[in-house]
Amino acid sequence: MLNQIVKLRTNLLQYTNKSFTKYELKLQTIQNSLYGVDLEYDAVEIAKLRLWLSLIVDQETNGLAPKPLPNLNFHLRVGNSLVDTFENIKLWSTRWRGTKKQAKVNNQMNLFNTDTVEAILKRLKDAKVQFFGTSDEKEKQKLSNQIEIEQMELIRSELVAQGKFDVYTRIEDMIKKKTKPFFIWELEFEEVFKNGQGFDIVIANPPYVQLQKEGGRLANELKDQGYETFTRTGDIYCIFYEKGIDLLKDCGILCYITSNKWMR
């Protein structure tokens, strides 16, 4: 996908007065257009390595020290891409933008308005941009912590507005133990979904596993996630199709490696 985007942009440059090296086009594309999620840590690390290698081969040093590689931790994520709730509770919604929410918690009225949310989102965006380009380890850790804190603050605001602060305390305890059983696309990649948008293209090779296998473990995990295609006797690839379509912007393109059984 990276090479295809760079090829298209290179062809378009001839109609403009702008000029970019292949390395610059790749770096811009990685920073602004490529995102990924996988349940397996090793798969994510391999994807990072492939992008780094693709950058290295086109970096012209001209006898100078090579430029530091970008930090991809917040572009390529480890997580369960099909689960975005906790205890069947929605943890974040882009509907926050442009609205005001009011919640009664412990007999106190808490008002979270768009100014508060937008300020957090702005800090989150700025921290991600800085994190992508920094090579200082201390600064990297500082920014990573800030991003996690800002995301948790948005989750807290959502749950408090729902009157479910007790749920937040349980999530906080899990995060401290390095456990996170959900992946919130609209929050992790908020810049993609702002203003009701989504991905232009979603590419995947979904697994083919019957939900009733392993004693119905997958069925139990997904039954309350709100998928219209869910049936206990179904296959997880159907859920992936629904999720992929849901992540697309209007007129977006879904590109999956799939069986031809449904065409027979």
Please annotate each region the language model reported.
Residues 1-20, 84-132, 146, 150-264:
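SAM-dependent methyltransferase catalytic-core segment centered on the flexible catalytic loop
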Residues 1-87, 258-264:
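Conserved S-adenosyl-L-methionine
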